[in-house]
Amino acid sequence: MSGTKWTEEQLSAITTRDCNLLVAAAAGSGKTAVLVERIIKIITNEENPIDIDKLLVVTFTSAAAAEMRERIANAISKKLDETPTSKNLQKQLTLLNRSNIMTIHSFCLGVIKNNFHKIDLDPSFRICDQTEGILLKMEIIDELFDDKYDEENQEFIKFIEAFSSYKSDNALKELVLSLYNFTMAGPWPKKWLKDASRDFDIKTLQELDETKWVNVLKESIKIELDGYIKMMQKAVKLINETDGLEPYFEGFSSELDLIVNAYNNVESSLNDLYNSLNLITFNRLKTIKKNTVSDENIQNLVKQIRDQVKKKISALIEGTFIASPDKMLDNIIKSYPYINQLTELTSEFIDRFTAKKKEKNILDFNDLEHLCLKILIEENEENQIVPSTIAQKFKDYFEEVLVDEYQDSNNVQEAIIELVSRKNSDNPNVFMVGDVKQSIYKFRQAKPELFIDKYNSYSLDKGINRKIQLYKNFRSREEIINGVNYIFKSVMSKTVGELEYTDVEALNLGANYPEKKNDDDIIGGPIEVHILDRSDNKEENDEFKLQAEEEIGDVNLEARIIVKRINELISKKEGNKFKVLDKDTGEYRDLKYKDIVILLRATKNWSEVLLDELGLAGIPVYADTGSGYFESIEIRTIMSLLKVIDNPMQDVPMLSLLISPIIGLSAEELSDIRLIDKEKYFYENIIKISKEKLISVELQEKCEYILSSIDKWRRKSIYMPIDEFIWYLYMDTAYYGYVGAMPNGVLRQANLKILFQRARQFSDTSFKGLFNFINFINKLTKSSGDMGSAKILGENEDVIRIMSIHKSKGLEFPVVFLAGCGKNFNLMDLNNKILYHEELGLGPEYINLENRTSITTLPKEAIKKRMKLETLSEEMRVLYVAFTRAKEKLIITGAVRNAEKSIEKWINSAVLDKDVVLPYEISKGKSYLDWIGMALCKHKDGEILRKKLGFSSEMCKDDLSMWKISIWNKYELDMYDELDENQEEEDVKISILDKDVNKEIKSEVYRRLGYEYEFKESTKLTSNISVSDLKKRNIEDDIDTLKMFDLEEEDNKNKDIITPKFLQEEKGISAAERGTAIHFAMKKIDFSKVGTLKEIKEQLNKLYDEELILQEEYNSINPYKILSFFKSSLGKKMLYVYNEGGKVYREVPFYTEISSLEIDESLPQKYANEKIRLQGIIDCFFKCDDEIILLDYKTDYVENEEEFKDKYKNQLSYYSEAIFKMTGKKVDKKYLYSFYLEKEILI
């Protein structure tokens, strides 16, 4: 660290002492390095060193705390290398193990453990997991409502009638739980509830005028009227500058005066404001004769501006003043009993939940902060809340309190920091570092206002409260820096963004990117914006385009643009290659897939499509989703199965089950079942069909099978623990094997394992049974507890990552695609019946029980307006985070319904001010693309936007940023992408046919149904079969291997159910599992580090550390065997190809067609044209000395080498055929490598 060249501002942040110091550290400014160096300087100060355990360092995550410790340890160790006799350094390295570098929750837990007696807590308490916490809440909320019903309290009954649905009170229970979670983010939840209720206890208009709600409404109205005034002023200016528009001047000026008058009355009483707004009228414009106006475009523009203002003022009055002030007051008064009931229910829930946790001697994460707070405060003689003696000890002990990611703190955490530090004393000692422009956790109740208040009040000069700004970015190229500054100077403001983005906040270039050495190379370049126009081209409406419109969704089309640019960036042609800077060598190199990330605001509904489209194009890709687990097809299918077993009288899950591979009915069969009796449930109709031959014998037999299966599963569910029952279903239905054979099968099976593990956690609680488990999962699905898919990828895999912007925070990538920018912001929460806000309290609808009508209230409208601005501000910061992830290239994509209309809207917003887009216009934006488009309409590179509507370049402003804007018609994009025969990526994903895979297990299920018809021989054939199964001589051998799944032999099957690794006790893994583990290792291993046993062991350790292989799998892999392969002549040949820059293709999936007679020669000749889809995964192939060499790894026990060769001969033939279809080149040599024999075998 001592060799680092610090900037002047960084040095100030490192060395400034004896004050509260706020460091505003922009993206890429070296925040963490500065924080670590400050700590090092403090503990190694020659004159007054401070022990590291006397510092409290609060981090946002445990991972950040661990990284901080590691960095400090490395820094101390380096200093020890320089001065090995330093006793202080040796002492600090020792003290580091007990240092207070931790999350706020860890700190609170330590305070509680050391002071449990102060709060009457049993010291043997434990922290409950999420599962147990959710189940307890469900139990308590049910008990609470049951008790309230028993009391027959009329106010409660009216509350239920007003806010529950006709069928249940679940929505109201959810409301109480949601409000509980919200209030627990504040320091005094029960006080907040009391205050929120008391706010509704008003009687007069004067009292209403003094409320926070009215102030917020006035602020909002002021912003809107200011926008309308500027719009009308712009129109009047254009009228004055344009010959022939003089007749408009008087009317426009008069209307402008009325709006100004209303603006001036904003600070008056609600009644006066209401009246002044209603005085605004728009009379008929005077007529202008044709051909008398010098510029008709200007005439149309001013009329459009006036029409917009007219509509918006009408909407403002109707939306804000939903009634007269008197009537709004009346609605508030009538809503008071409802609000009182809600707050009392929530408060009682808090008490009951607290009592239940005390009874069980458990705490949850909310308790950690609140109990810590309870320990740190006490009442003095004047009944004032003051720091306790324990808090005072912390104040005296900690020499400095350092808070990382301060922009994400909430009010509880702020209170705790104040109580254990000397922040409010004459000897302050708090260091806070963060970037408010990256505060994107408001959904976790983060309070960026805490940072903003200090940023606005702290001084740059000397004083006890100081701030230092770090705005030099050491991450990104100049093109990225300039682009970020241009966009956010244009659109970020105090109104939307909660911070003005001025030259002070702008990023400054700090990274040093060298010039390119080869003129043909491509580096950096302008930021790209690709706009997909979804409108129809009426002049071109042929059959091909209609088909494209029907078959390709908007997300797919946007994905095609991304695929096209990726293929262009990672070009297979010589010359003109896109290069990125290698951070290790300092030289430019070819772009790799792992250098690219695709960022999404939310991955749901997008990541699957992107995976499919990139996969079809042969681009290796992985989606790192933070959610969507419960939306995956395999989890939805199993949950539908569980719901049907619990209660078959549910049509939605029943339908999902019937069409799933578990049952596999056709659309026609489903229709036949439904038409038996449309008024009955599917289950009832299935019963009816099973008893009578109403359709066909086949359907009757299927219905009998469905009923017998459901009956069997229901009986099993009664006595089996839920986790064992779920695994039983996986095996009994063969669904676990089925999803493993689907695309992304490893991930799908991992997802099913997660569900099993979740069921095991559930079994460890006091709640039992299928019904409770389904309810628990439903709660998780509705809450923010969606867990994201299983992790199956290492960080160094050469694949493109797809992730949410939130997941990307703190990361950086050479090339960033920011996709889905045309998607509308999610403002659905603003439509809830009751809104709540930390400052403004509760905002309900008023429900009139007499006529069953609802109407919004003034509190709700006030909260709605504030929440909308806060949500948009959060979105602005999320966009900033996305932009600043890019190091060298940023590519933005987004779709609009109609490009011309969108551009017209952007230009109309942009023309109102030369330098920025007005905050009012930004607040009306519905997507990131709206904001970006408004800004780019004013940029010199936005000519393509202005030209589309005939606008001149006079509105342009000079700027250093460079942009390349493209507008795509949806018909320009090819429907299908062909695989290039010279494709260079290592992990090729090929789909010769479609990707719909039905496996042999499904065929076996149908076989057991006992069909008897003309082509019954073909029932032995699957529509798909894997190559590994073709090593059998005929299909009957395959059927024997599937006996373990026999649905009719229930008793025997229980003995044969495969027990997963995580259910086994003291047992090793199977030979097949061992083989899978070795194959996985051979796919993941880095060929550049296989020269020694140590290197191979290190790579296997890494796979285990990254949780890519389980403990049992890790133990089963013999590193000596892998080293032996690389020492063999075949292994050396492969390494030679790799080291010379050739491509070694590993784990290549494929699908192709073969004749059914190749599967079973005994079939009649009439099946010669019957095709079977063949799928498999080729272990490895590569080109060496103009020969294509195929290699297949085997881990079998080998007794006879010739029999071993004969066993796999056909399998390698199919692989060879697949390689020919992919590359157009024949395989010259086919090898088996036996890890058992440690020998290569030529076939």
Curated annotation (Swiss-Prot):
One of its GO terms (molecular function) is ATP binding. The keyword Isomerase applies. Residues 512-810 form the UvrD-like helicase C-terminal domain. It catalyses: Couples ATP hydrolysis with the unwinding of duplex DNA by translocating in the 3'-5' direction; ATP + H2O = ADP + phosphate + H(+). Its cofactor is Mg(2+). One of its GO terms (biological process) is double-strand break repair via homologous recombination. GO terms for cellular component: cytosol; DNA helicase complex. ATP binds at A25, A26, A27, G28, S29, G30, K31, T32. InterPro entries: AddA (IPR014152), DNA_helicase_UvrD-like_C (IPR014017), DNA_helicase_UvrD/REP (IPR000212), P-loop_NTPase (IPR027417), PDDEXK-like_dom_sf (IPR011604), PDDEXK_AddAB-type (IPR038726), Restrct_endonuc-II-like (IPR011335), UvrD-like_ATP-bd (IPR014016). Its EC number is 3.1.-.-, 5.6.2.4. Keywords: ATP-binding, DNA damage, DNA repair, DNA-binding, Exonuclease, Helicase, Hydrolase, Isomerase, Nuclease, Nucleotide-binding. Residues 4-477 form the UvrD-like helicase ATP-binding domain. Pfam families: PDDEXK_1, UvrD-helicase, UvrD_C. Heterodimer of AddA and AddB/RexB. The heterodimer acts as both an ATP-dependent DNA helicase and an ATP-dependent, dual-direction single-stranded exonuclease. Recognizes the chi site generating a DNA molecule suitable for the initiation of homologous recombination. The AddA nuclease domain is required for chi fragment generation; this subunit has the helicase and 3' -> 5' nuclease activities. Belongs to the helicase family. AddA subfamily. This is ATP-dependent helicase/nuclease subunit A. It comes from Clostridium botulinum (strain Eklund 17B / Type B).
